[in-house]
Design a protein with these regions (language model features):
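ATP-dependent adenylate-forming carboxylate-activation enzymes
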Residues: 32, 76-77, 94-112, 124-127, ...
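Structural core segment of the AMP-binding/adenylate-forming
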Residues: 87, 91-165, 271, 278
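Adenylate-forming
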Residues: 18, 48, 52, 72, 125-129, 255, 270-307, ...
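N-lobe entry segment of adenylate-forming
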Residues: 1-68, 162-165
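Conserved AMP-binding/adenylation subdomain of ANL enzymes
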Residues: 195-221, 228-276, 280-282, 288
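Conserved AMP-binding A3 loop
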Residues: 42-46, 172-200
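Conserved AMP-binding/adenylate-forming
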Residues: 38-42, 56-103, 219-220, 224-227
Length: 307
């Protein structure tokens, strides 16, 4: 069960390692429906690893392997498929591109063109043409989340064999700036960047003072409303907590951005004791006494982003 030390681990190989040795570890928890009162379904690290291999197997005949980190865009609802896509295309040598759905057509096209993207993946219910128009990229719909996670049968294993030294500078994800002052600029994330976060989460206590981010390594259920096309929702509060640590990220509804109301429901029905949200969510909650009362069991409230 030997594991590379924190700061030298790689998401694809570490997910596979944990799926082998700690298969029942809870990676995340997802809503059973858009009605959050219906409860949440836990996803184990083994479920997550299988879903990645299933998607890699599905995509290999369509996009093949890349030796030059070809860009593969993905558009979908707010669900775990964003994280599955990141690792699945990485195992095939590609890098994922996420363009925020709120972006205008010119913004989407700018990101596709500047990253030399010729392949677009999407969920079945997404109208890609409304986002990218007649862009020449080849388009492929991917399976439903439930099929990727829990289809019968064992998918073929797609190993990630590179060492940390070989992969640390390799790109695996492209996000972008806000575009508030012009066209959004691509931000390429490397495996080395993700490893830096691994190191950061494992900084030991200094003179008895615990580094706050080390709490990511402790076991807790945490509601996060950061979208997966944002670095917060994809890496920092998407992959990192459940792979580098033991926080179980509880996801919001897939069909809409979570407001303060949904955040309260995530805490209530997802049994959360931690929150990761933007200041606007807290403003909504503190101005509603009923919601505020439901937050009594929350022992940590983290915030980030604009209002």
């Amino acid at each position: 069960m030997d594991s590379p030390q924190a700061g030298r681990r790689l998401f694809p190989s570490e997910i596979d390692r944990q799926a082998k040795y700690t298969p029942n570890k809870i990676f995340a928890s997802i809503p059973r429906s858009s009605d959050l009162s219906k409860g949440f379904q836990d996803v184990t690290i083994k479920d997550f690893a299988r879903s990645i291999n299933r998607l890699s197997a599905y995509l290999e005949p369509l996009i093949g392997y890349s030796k030059t980190f070809n860009t593969v865009a993905y558009f979908g609802p707010l669900d775990l498929r964003y994280l599955i896509v990141i690792i699945a295309v990485s195992k095939l040598g590609h890098k994922a591109l996420f363009s925020a759905p709120r972006n205008s057509l010119p913004m989407h096209l700018h990101l596709l063109n500047t990253t030399d993207c010729h392949t677009i993946l999407h969920a079945h219910q997404i109208d890609v043409s409304s986002m990218v128009g007649t862009h020449e990229a080849v388009r492929h719909a991917i399976p439903e989340l439930e099929d990727l996670l829990w289809a019968k049968g064992e998918p073929p294993h797609y190993p990630f064999t590179k060492t940390f030294e070989e992969a640390k500078n390799d790109p695996f994800l492209v996000l972008h700036t806000s575009g508030s002052t012009g066209m959004p600029k691509p931000i390429v994330q490397s495996h080395g960047y993700a490893a830096i976060m691994d190191t950061h989460f494992h900084i030991p206590s200094i003179n008895g003072v615990q580094v706050k981010t080390s709490m990511i390594t402790t076991t807790a259920r945490a509601a996060s409303v950061f979208p997966p096309w944002h670095v917060g929702g994809s890496i920092l509060l998407g992959l990192c907590p459940g792979v580098w640590g033991n926080n179980i990220i509880v996801w919001g509804p897939a069909d809409r951005m979570a407001s303060g109301k949904e955040l309260v429901e995530m805490v209530k029905y997802g049994n959360c004791t931690r929150i990761f949200a933007a200041p606007a969510h807290y403003d909504q909650i503190v101005n509603n006494p009923e919601w505020l009362e439901l937050m009594e069991k929350v022992d940590q409230a983290w915030y980030g982003g604009g209002t």
